[in-house]
Amino acid sequence: MSASDSSSAVVVLAAGAGTRMKSDLQKTLHSIGGRSLISHSLHAAAGLNPTHIVAVIGHGRDQVGPAVEDVATHLGREVRIAIQEEQNGTGHAVQCAMDQLEGFDGTIIVTNGDVPLLTSDTLGSLLAAHTATPTAVTVLTMNLDDPTGYGRIVRNADGEVTAIVEQKDASDEERSITEVNSGVFAFDATILRSALSQLKSDNAQGELYLTDVLGIARSEGHPVRAHIAADARELAGVNDRVQLAEAGAELNRRTVEAAMRGGATIVDPATTWIDVEVTIGRDVLINPGTQLRGTTSIGDRAEIGPDTTLTNMVIGTGASVIRTHGSDSEIGEDATVGPFTYIRPGTKLGAEGKLGGFVETKKATIGRGSKVPHLTYVGDATIGEYSNIGASSVFVNYDGVNKNHTTIGSHVRTGSDTMFIAPVTVGDGAYSGAGTVIKDDVPPGALAVSGGRQRNIEGWVQKKRPGTAAADAAAAAQNSVPNQEG
């Protein structure tokens, strides 16, 4: 439901302790698919474009409050926060939320911060069903093959909801009902306010139950109805780590399927993990063991993996990234990366460039067509176009106190095992010999070499390491050399 609905508000309940998670992190802050549980719920709420969104927080509010504010910033809209000082039941939580909805008289949807699979479409269908006919409360329900543990929905002959009966209180006939309560509701705001003021805590838990609103509404002659969700999986709550993993797997299945239907080939969906904010172009090939995290963007016709993890990366059209771990960086069009490449934040590889095996980069800008083929560290550096960095080279950027910058020009060729002692600049078209330690700037077109002439000390092994295998091998080799005299 994308159009603005000025007559709706959404309340997200996220005040519980979530003790079954056995975590120092508040339950709704655990993540699947690159978002926290409460972020998923707030995104679903925002998809309705309601007048107000209210998050009710309590336990761990020092953690949850800033997280809600971050999501609101990401959504570009206000999310009001209500504090439930004492966790005294779902009815009390909604009472706390109503302070943020003073004067609002439309439809209030109440959902939970631990149902990450619930979509805006399903909330929209609930809202549409609720407003189609005058209704006090509409319960979002689901049909389950095994309803054990859930509150059963009891309807009358007209299809109205007469009761929600909990498992422990249900008769055998009621236990056979497969339609159950999801814990998500749509309320008429005026009726909800009145009913909330009448809630009592005369129950085994001594709490105020939101479900008691239904009985109050019916006792006053207001209709209570149910709307069955099309996909019960959306309403699966997360209460422990097992359910967190199950929800994550289901969300990933959806995300991977959407990518394939959008034109990407995913060789093995079972070993491919894609966060919900990842974007993937057409004719992309994703090989097994690939993880695409955060806001990663994959251009058309790129190939990713196998065994690759990319977080907040931008991959250009036609690029190939194989057996690579990369984050917060950009790979240009038709560039090649891997295998066994480590791309740290701030790397920008130009179009048609190459980062090869066992190369590590950090805060490095590498120009179009330039290559770093193997066994090299490039940190705090700028490399121009069409340059080649020899194997086993190191950009020595740290002097023990500061990180320093190296600048390599275009069309530069450096020999293997070159050390660049930053800060240093190598001009366009320059070369370096193998094993060179570059401490001073190299002018354009110059050849940089360091070190003296090679010196061989004859017979050193036999004198210093007599009796060793090396000495014996040397002696045998020397004795086999033909005598050139006479």
Curated annotation (Swiss-Prot):
Which cofactors? Mg(2+)
Binding residues for acetyl-CoA: A391, N397, Y398, S416, A434
Q: Which residues form a coiled coil?
A: none
Q: Which residues does the annotated region (Pyrophosphorylase) include? A: 1-241
**Taxonomic classification, please?**
Bacteria, Bacillati, Actinomycetota, Actinomycetes, Mycobacteriales
Species of origin reads Corynebacterium efficiens (strain DSM 44549 / YS-314 / AJ 12310 / JCM 11189 / NBRC 100395)
Record carries keyword Glycoprotein: no
Q: What would be the name of the gene that encodes this protein?
A: glmU
**InterPro entries reported for this sequence:** Bifunctional_GlmU, GlmU-like, GlmU_C_LbH, Hexapep, MobA-like_NTP_Trfase, Nucleotide-diphossugar_trans, Trimer_LpxA-like_sf
Q: Where is this region: Linker?
A: 242-262
Q: What does this protein do?
A: Catalyzes the last two sequential reactions in the de novo biosynthetic pathway for UDP-N-acetylglucosamine (UDP-GlcNAc). The C-terminal domain catalyzes the transfer of acetyl group from acetyl coenzyme A to glucosamine-1-phosphate (GlcN-1-P) to produce N-acetylglucosamine-1-phosphate (GlcNAc-1-P), which is converted into UDP-GlcNAc by the transfer of uridine 5-monophosphate (from uridine 5-triphosphate), a reaction catalyzed by the N-terminal domain.
Predominant cellular place of this UniProt entry's protein: cytoplasm
Please state which protein family the record places this protein in: In the N-terminal section; belongs to the N-acetylglucosamine-1-phosphate uridyltransferase family.
| Subunit comment | Homotrimer.
Give the record's cofactor note, including how many are bound: Binds 1 Mg(2+) ion per subunit.
The pathway it acts in is:
Nucleotide-sugar biosynthesis; UDP-N-acetyl-alpha-D-glucosamine biosynthesis; N-acetyl-alpha-D-glucosamine 1-phosphate from alpha-D-glucosamine 6-phosphate (route II): step 2/2; Nucleotide-sugar biosynthesis; UDP-N-acetyl-alpha-D-glucosamine biosynthesis; UDP-N-acetyl-alpha-D-glucosamine from N-acetyl-alpha-D-glucosamine 1-phosphate: step 1/1; Bacterial outer membrane biogenesis; LPS lipid A biosynthesis
User: Which compartments is it annotated to reside in?
Assistant: Cytoplasm
Put simply, this protein is called Bifunctional protein GlmU
Catalytic positions?
Answer: H374 (proton acceptor)
Binding of UDP-N-acetyl-alpha-D-glucosamine occurs at: 13-16, 27, 84, 89-90, 151, 166, 181, 239, 344, 362, 377, 388
Write out the residues that bind Mg(2+): D114, N239
Task: Tell me one GO molecular function of this protein.
Answer: magnesium ion binding
Instruction: Provide the catalytic activity annotation.
Output: alpha-D-glucosamine 1-phosphate + acetyl-CoA = N-acetyl-alpha-D-glucosamine 1-phosphate + CoA + H(+); N-acetyl-alpha-D-glucosamine 1-phosphate + UTP + H(+) = UDP-N-acetyl-alpha-D-glucosamine + diphosphate
